[in-house]
């Protein structure tokens, strides 16, 4: 394989991994521990 192909595959898989981790953090079991500043603020 060419070097450019390997770099593109690596960068693409890195971006997909970061996206999957952020979705898991936002909606997974750990999301119960996240605080919501809009719910804490009362008018």
UniProtKB/Swiss-Prot annotation:
Keyword list, A-Z: Chloroplast, Membrane, Plastid, Thylakoid, Transmembrane, Transmembrane helix
Cellular compartments annotated: Plastid, Chloroplast thylakoid membrane
One Pfam family per UniProt: PsbN
Membrane spanning stretches: 4-24
A single GO BP: photosynthesis
Lipid bilayer topology: Single-pass membrane protein
Record's GO cellular component terms: chloroplast thylakoid membrane
Recorded family membership: Belongs to the PsbN family.
Function: May play a role in photosystem I and II biogenesis.
Protein name from the UniProt record: Protein PsbN
Taxonomy of the source species: Eukaryota, Sar, Stramenopiles, Ochrophyta, Bacillariophyta
Gene behind the chain: psbN
């Amino acid at each position: 394989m060419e070097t450019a192909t390997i770099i593109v595959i690596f960068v693409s898989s890195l971006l997909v991994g970061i996206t999957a981790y952020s979705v898991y953090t936002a909606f997974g079991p750990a999301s119960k521990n996240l605080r919501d500043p809009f719910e804490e603020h009362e008018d």
